[in-house]
Amino acid sequence: MKNFLFVLLIALSSFSCNQITEPENTETSMNDVINDALTEMENDTSVKSFSSPIRYNDYIINLQTRVYEKIITLVKCFDTCDDKELRASYADFGEEAIATLKEIKRLGDYSGNTDFRDKATDLFAFYVEVYEGAYKELIDIVISGKMDEKTEKKMNKIVEEVSEKETALDNAFQIAQQKFADENGMQIIENDLQKEIDNL
Protein backbone atom coordinates (compact mmCIF):
# COMPACT_ATOMS: atom_id res chain seq x y z
CA MET A 1 0.00 0.00 0.00
CA LYS A 2 2.90 2.32 0.70
CA ASN A 3 3.77 2.70 -2.97
CA PHE A 4 0.48 4.48 -3.72
CA LEU A 5 1.14 7.20 -1.18
CA PHE A 6 4.81 7.28 -2.14
CA VAL A 7 3.82 8.03 -5.73
CA LEU A 8 1.64 10.81 -4.37
CA LEU A 9 4.58 12.12 -2.35
CA ILE A 10 6.75 12.18 -5.46
CA ALA A 11 4.01 14.06 -7.26
CA LEU A 12 3.92 16.60 -4.45
CA SER A 13 7.66 16.98 -4.12
CA SER A 14 8.94 17.83 -7.60
CA PHE A 15 11.70 20.42 -7.17
CA SER A 16 9.86 23.35 -5.66
CA CYS A 17 11.50 22.95 -2.28
CA ASN A 18 14.41 25.28 -3.01
CA GLN A 19 16.28 27.92 -1.12
CA ILE A 20 17.64 31.13 -2.57
CA THR A 21 21.17 32.20 -1.80
CA GLU A 22 22.71 35.61 -2.12
CA PRO A 23 26.22 35.85 -3.59
CA GLU A 24 27.66 36.70 -0.17
CA ASN A 25 27.16 34.53 2.92
CA THR A 26 24.58 35.67 5.44
CA GLU A 27 25.28 35.22 9.14
CA THR A 28 21.69 34.57 10.12
CA SER A 29 20.52 31.03 9.43
CA MET A 30 17.20 30.36 7.76
CA ASN A 31 15.89 28.51 10.81
CA ASP A 32 16.71 31.40 13.13
CA VAL A 33 14.93 33.86 10.87
CA ILE A 34 11.87 31.65 10.49
CA ASN A 35 11.68 30.83 14.19
CA ASP A 36 11.82 34.54 15.01
CA ALA A 37 9.10 35.23 12.47
CA LEU A 38 6.87 32.46 13.77
CA THR A 39 7.30 33.61 17.36
CA GLU A 40 6.31 37.14 16.38
CA MET A 41 3.20 36.00 14.57
CA GLU A 42 1.80 33.55 17.12
CA ASN A 43 -0.67 36.08 18.46
CA ASP A 44 -0.49 38.50 15.55
CA THR A 45 -2.92 38.84 12.69
CA SER A 46 -1.14 41.70 10.93
CA VAL A 47 0.42 41.42 7.49
CA LYS A 48 3.83 39.74 7.61
CA SER A 49 6.65 41.49 5.77
CA PHE A 50 10.40 41.11 5.30
CA SER A 51 13.12 43.63 4.51
CA SER A 52 15.33 41.05 2.75
CA PRO A 53 14.38 39.05 -0.36
CA ILE A 54 16.25 35.99 0.88
CA ARG A 55 14.31 36.06 4.14
CA TYR A 56 11.08 36.46 2.20
CA ASN A 57 11.91 33.42 0.05
CA ASP A 58 13.12 31.34 2.96
CA TYR A 59 9.95 32.08 4.90
CA ILE A 60 7.84 30.66 2.06
CA ILE A 61 10.11 27.65 1.56
CA ASN A 62 10.19 26.90 5.28
CA LEU A 63 6.40 26.79 5.34
CA GLN A 64 6.48 24.38 2.41
CA THR A 65 9.17 22.29 4.12
CA ARG A 66 7.04 21.95 7.25
CA VAL A 67 4.27 20.38 5.18
CA TYR A 68 6.69 18.08 3.33
CA GLU A 69 8.14 16.82 6.61
CA LYS A 70 4.64 15.77 7.71
CA ILE A 71 4.07 14.05 4.35
CA ILE A 72 7.35 12.13 4.70
CA THR A 73 6.36 11.04 8.22
CA LEU A 74 2.98 9.91 6.90
CA VAL A 75 4.58 7.88 4.09
CA LYS A 76 6.94 6.16 6.55
CA CYS A 77 3.98 5.49 8.85
CA PHE A 78 2.34 3.37 6.16
CA ASP A 79 5.03 0.71 6.73
CA THR A 80 5.33 0.88 10.51
CA CYS A 81 2.10 2.22 12.03
CA ASP A 82 -1.14 0.63 13.08
CA ASP A 83 -4.44 2.16 11.96
CA LYS A 84 -4.66 4.51 14.94
CA GLU A 85 -1.13 5.81 14.44
CA LEU A 86 -1.75 6.21 10.71
CA ARG A 87 -4.83 8.32 11.39
CA ALA A 88 -2.83 10.42 13.87
CA SER A 89 -0.05 11.00 11.33
CA TYR A 90 -2.64 11.95 8.73
CA ALA A 91 -4.18 14.42 11.20
CA ASP A 92 -0.74 15.94 11.90
CA PHE A 93 -0.25 16.50 8.18
CA GLY A 94 -3.66 18.15 7.93
CA GLU A 95 -3.04 20.47 10.86
CA GLU A 96 0.26 21.58 9.35
CA ALA A 97 -1.24 22.07 5.89
CA ILE A 98 -4.04 24.23 7.29
CA ALA A 99 -1.67 26.22 9.53
CA THR A 100 0.78 26.99 6.73
CA LEU A 101 -2.02 28.09 4.41
CA LYS A 102 -3.20 30.54 7.07
CA GLU A 103 0.35 31.82 7.52
CA ILE A 104 1.06 32.33 3.81
CA LYS A 105 -2.18 34.28 3.47
CA ARG A 106 -0.78 36.81 5.97
CA LEU A 107 2.35 37.43 3.92
CA GLY A 108 2.54 40.76 2.13
CA ASP A 109 4.21 41.46 -1.19
CA TYR A 110 7.93 42.03 -1.58
CA SER A 111 8.72 45.33 -3.31
CA GLY A 112 5.56 45.03 -5.36
CA ASN A 113 6.08 41.36 -6.28
CA THR A 114 2.93 39.43 -5.37
CA ASP A 115 3.26 36.58 -7.86
CA PHE A 116 5.65 34.45 -5.78
CA ARG A 117 3.42 34.69 -2.71
CA ASP A 118 0.25 34.10 -4.75
CA LYS A 119 1.63 30.99 -6.44
CA ALA A 120 2.76 29.69 -3.03
CA THR A 121 -0.75 30.31 -1.70
CA ASP A 122 -2.21 28.30 -4.57
CA LEU A 123 0.18 25.44 -3.82
CA PHE A 124 -0.51 25.51 -0.07
CA ALA A 125 -4.26 25.52 -0.73
CA PHE A 126 -3.65 22.40 -2.79
CA TYR A 127 -2.00 20.69 0.20
CA VAL A 128 -5.17 21.33 2.21
CA GLU A 129 -7.29 20.06 -0.67
CA VAL A 130 -5.21 16.86 -0.83
CA TYR A 131 -5.55 16.40 2.93
CA GLU A 132 -9.32 16.79 2.83
CA GLY A 133 -9.79 14.71 -0.31
CA ALA A 134 -7.22 12.40 -1.89
CA TYR A 135 -5.21 11.47 1.21
CA LYS A 136 -8.34 10.82 3.24
CA GLU A 137 -9.74 8.59 0.53
CA LEU A 138 -6.49 6.64 0.14
CA ILE A 139 -6.09 6.13 3.88
CA ASP A 140 -9.71 5.03 4.26
CA ILE A 141 -9.17 2.46 1.51
CA VAL A 142 -5.97 1.13 3.06
CA ILE A 143 -7.44 0.89 6.56
CA SER A 144 -10.51 -0.91 5.23
CA GLY A 145 -8.20 -3.70 4.04
CA LYS A 146 -10.35 -4.29 0.96
CA MET A 147 -7.83 -4.39 -1.86
CA ASP A 148 -8.82 -5.79 -5.23
CA GLU A 149 -8.28 -4.85 -8.87
CA LYS A 150 -11.14 -2.34 -8.85
CA THR A 151 -9.82 -0.65 -5.70
CA GLU A 152 -6.30 -0.54 -7.11
CA LYS A 153 -7.57 1.19 -10.26
CA LYS A 154 -9.43 3.69 -8.11
CA MET A 155 -6.28 4.45 -6.12
CA ASN A 156 -4.25 4.86 -9.30
CA LYS A 157 -6.83 7.27 -10.67
CA ILE A 158 -6.69 9.36 -7.48
CA VAL A 159 -2.90 9.55 -7.68
CA GLU A 160 -2.97 10.49 -11.38
CA GLU A 161 -5.47 13.29 -10.78
CA VAL A 162 -3.46 14.69 -7.88
CA SER A 163 -0.23 14.47 -9.86
CA GLU A 164 -1.69 16.32 -12.83
CA LYS A 165 -3.01 19.17 -10.73
CA GLU A 166 0.10 19.42 -8.60
CA THR A 167 2.39 19.52 -11.63
CA ALA A 168 0.65 22.61 -12.97
CA LEU A 169 0.70 24.35 -9.57
CA ASP A 170 4.30 23.41 -8.88
CA ASN A 171 5.47 24.60 -12.30
CA ALA A 172 3.77 27.95 -11.74
CA PHE A 173 5.36 28.18 -8.28
CA GLN A 174 8.85 27.42 -9.62
CA ILE A 175 8.52 29.99 -12.41
CA ALA A 176 7.42 32.63 -9.88
CA GLN A 177 10.28 31.74 -7.54
CA GLN A 178 12.83 31.92 -10.35
CA LYS A 179 11.48 35.30 -11.44
CA PHE A 180 11.71 36.51 -7.84
CA ALA A 181 15.31 35.29 -7.65
CA ASP A 182 16.22 36.95 -10.95
CA GLU A 183 14.65 40.25 -9.90
CA ASN A 184 16.72 40.23 -6.71
CA GLY A 185 20.03 38.95 -8.11
CA MET A 186 19.96 35.61 -6.32
CA GLN A 187 20.45 31.94 -7.17
CA ILE A 188 18.19 28.98 -6.39
CA ILE A 189 19.75 25.89 -4.83
CA GLU A 190 18.18 22.52 -4.05
CA ASN A 191 16.83 22.13 -0.54
CA ASP A 192 18.28 19.28 1.56
CA LEU A 193 14.74 17.98 2.10
CA GLN A 194 14.54 17.14 -1.61
CA LYS A 195 17.50 14.80 -1.13
CA GLU A 196 15.67 13.07 1.73
CA ILE A 197 12.60 12.62 -0.47
CA ASP A 198 14.76 11.21 -3.27
CA ASN A 199 16.29 8.68 -0.85
CA LEU A 200 12.94 7.30 0.40
For each predicted feature, which ranges?
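Immediate post-signal-peptide N-terminus of mature secreted/exported proteins
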Residues: I20-A91, N191-L200
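Short, charged/polar, low-complexity loop and linker segments
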Residues: E42-V47, T73-C77, A99-G112, K146-M155
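Short, charged, amphipathic alpha-helical segments
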Residues: L86-G94, R117-D122, E149-E161
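Short, solvent-exposed, charged loop/turn and helix-capping segments
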Residues: T100-D122, I139-V142, Q177, N184
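A charged, solvent-exposed segment within the mature domains of Sec-exported extracytoplasmic proteins
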Residues: G133-L200
